Amino acid sequence: MIIREVVRPLPGARRLSLLRQRLAYSDSARFWERNYARGATSGSGSYGALAEGKSRFLNTLVRGHAVRSVIEFGCGDGNQLSLADYPRYVGLDVSRSAIALCQRRFADDPAKSFFLYDGTCFTDRAGMFTADLALSLDVVYHLTEDTVFETYLTHLFAAGRRLVVIYSTNEEISDTAPHVRHRHFTPWIEANCPGWALTGVTRGPSPDRARADFFVYERQ
């Protein structure tokens, strides 16, 4: 896989805007709690054609692999989930407001459960939070802190009994907003998640230069 670092000169107005955003930014968890608490959504990737494209891929994968249960680390506002066809589902998120949104939205669905996720307080040696498929959609490139990134992936792969699917960019890209940090994440998984193999990479529906793809891992 070819790695490229995209660095472009920024216009003055955009440079100033990014500076202001960076000064206001504290950490990823607080950013997303503020986002949902003020009524904002999970973003354009969870709506419209992008959301539909992701759901087609995932629903096909779930059927093709006879997946009976899914756990998602980063369920957001639940709009992407509304397009999913999963037999049983557990959604985790760092934002209390996002969890409350999902609990209300899917209150009448007995096959879905939601829990607040805090990586610093999450220990699951008993395997209570596991599923056939562990899912991460548009999350990895929002993990701006190294420790948060590493803890998140450790928990994600521990939760997958058979499959892990990550939808993310996989390259270093500069000049981004402070809540975005594009990473070349696959080498970290190869080095730190033994017993897993990357068995497929499928191009995602995003046309952007910072294109996210589906990375499918299977337990060996």
Sequence positions of predicted segments:
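Short catalytic micro-motifs in class I SAM-dependent methyltransferases
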Residues: 138-142
